[in-house]
Amino acid sequence: MPRIPLEDNFTDVIGKAQRGLKLSDANLAEKAGLSRTDLAAIQGGEIRELALLAVARPLGLERNALLALARREWYPEQPLFKRSFAMFNTAFEDMTVNSYLVWDTKTRLAAAFDTGTSAQGMLDTLAGENLTLRYIFLTHTHDDHIADLDRLAETKAEIWNSELEPLGRLGAKTFQENAHFHLGELSIKTLFTWGHSPGQTTFYITGLSWPLAIVGDSLFASSMGGSATNYDMQLKNNRQKIMKLPLDTVLACGHGPLTTIKQERKHNPFFAHHA
């Protein structure tokens, strides 16, 4: 798979934090001690380092991580799975979206996480690996994540998503937080990390080469999903339920590349200072 670019740049991170905190440009400029000209410049993508450092504090962002993102100094080291894990990256408008497949090597039972805009790669992997799809888990129900659900549902796999964001589809089932599912030696636990959407769910999986958290749009490498209405809860859920997972946990995000807890604790402007 070609290298997947980071989902967000530094202007996206600044914008998400500003909208989440409901700060007007005038408020933010005053809190940061910046002129409106300097603020407009960095919002427009100009790298003014002193202005970036100044704006980080009122936005609750870690200044060094924000500056490194602006300088494009970091890209997450990609973890390798020896087996039983596949990532699919499909186009959606002017961006891409990820979906995932895990399976147990003995029983050949598999679980899918979202569909992206095309489930063809996932279906090809199921056939090529001689797998039976047992579960289709949804991180949330935004269109880009479930666009090909009808086709994947033809496998007759069980469809599951959060009780906080019911799909409204005949036969779909809902889970509560801390629900447990099993595929042979694989264990899957649900964590409610809502904020980006009402039922945004993280799936924590053990039994693979590394602990794995499929986080949907809860967070991305160097960023997180946007939330203009539940920003505080999204930060709280991410900090308490995702960022406290073991350091070697691989984060499989809804957009952008894979990353790890260890890397995000150092490089994500939203979370680095809470490590």
What are these regions (language model features)?
Residues 20-38:
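Short alpha-helical DNA-recognition segment
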Residues 61-75:
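Short C-terminal boundary/hinge segments that cap the last helix of small helical domains
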Residues 1-21:
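A short, Lys/Arg-rich alpha-helix, primarily the initiator
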Residues 50-65:
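DNA major-groove recognition helix of helix-turn-helix/homeodomain DNA-binding modules
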Residues 101, 180-208:
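Core dinuclear metal-dependent hydrolase active-site scaffold
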Residues 198-275:
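Metallo-beta-lactamase
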Residues 47, 118-187, 211:
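Active-site HxH/HxHxD metal-binding segment of metal-dependent hydrolases
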Residues 77-128, 203-216, 222:
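Conserved beta-strand hairpin/beta-sheet module of binuclear metal-dependent hydrolase folds
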